[in-house]
Amino acid sequence: MEQESLNQERLVEEIAKRVKEILQLIGEDTEREGLKETPERVAKALLEMTSALRSPQPYIKVFSLAENENSSVEDQIVLVKDISFSSLCEHHLLPIIGKVHVAYVVGKSGKVAGLSKIIRLVNYYASRPQIQERLVEQIAEAIMKSDIQPKGVMVIGDALHMCTYVRGVKDREASLISLSTRGIFSTKPSLKSQVFRLINTSKKSSTFL
């Protein structure tokens, strides 16, 4: 733990030096009151937003829904909707802010994951320089290969990208929707329709899907 703390302090120090250099290159006075602590703050924020690069993937702990040998939850759709996430666009290192919906079909094992485990997985793959299309693919693949042993997985991402919001075309309305499917969701369109209906049931007032 002490070694990790020392490594973190060293990373903050090294990144802060470079942030200070960048500020100076764009013409800022890094000694003025408002910027004195900015390099260190930026370094800490960047490390927090990319923490997954230095951490293992969280384990998806599962449990069985079947109460006895004669009961079955096979083929049940489990949906975790409106998981908020933030990430960094790998092209400009500007924020991506949105929501992810994760659905899976329970397999023969009758196993499901706790709600927090799915949320942690989403946050893990978001905590790095990322593109949204890859994000939903990585989440879907991780769940498909997990101990849940689902028959299929469907992941939908809907987000605003600050790289088009504050620069370039400066569009304030456009959002990106990405979809990834695995297993039975790839072969049965009716299941995808069911998930979309579930997502829109009791839909919260939101900018996102």
Curated annotation (Swiss-Prot):
Binding, Zn(2+):
C89, H92, C163
State a GO cellular component annotated for this protein: cytoplasm
PROSITE patterns hit by this protein: GTP_CYCLOHYDROL_1_1, GTP_CYCLOHYDROL_1_2
Q: Which reaction does it catalyse?
A: GTP + H2O = 7,8-dihydroneopterin 3'-triphosphate + formate + H(+)
- Pathway in which the depicted protein is active: Cofactor biosynthesis; 7,8-dihydroneopterin triphosphate biosynthesis; 7,8-dihydroneopterin triphosphate from GTP: step 1/1
Q: Under which EC number(s) is this enzyme classified?
A: 3.5.4.16
Q: Which UniProt keywords apply?
A: GTP-binding, Hydrolase, Metal-binding, Nucleotide-binding, One-carbon metabolism, Zinc
> What residue intervals traverse the membrane?
none
Q: Which GO terms describe its molecular function?
A: GTP binding; GTP cyclohydrolase I activity; zinc ion binding
GO BP annotations of the record are: one-carbon metabolic process; tetrahydrobiopterin biosynthetic process; tetrahydrofolate biosynthetic process
Q: Which Pfam families does the entry mention?
A: GTP_cyclohydroI
Q: How does it assemble?
A: Toroid-shaped homodecamer, composed of two pentamers of five dimers.
Q: Which family does it belong to?
A: Belongs to the GTP cyclohydrolase I family.
What is this protein called in UniProt? GTP cyclohydrolase 1
Organism the protein comes from: Sulfolobus acidocaldarius (strain ATCC 33909 / DSM 639 / JCM 8929 / NBRC 15157 / NCIMB 11770)
**Gene encoding this chain?**
folE
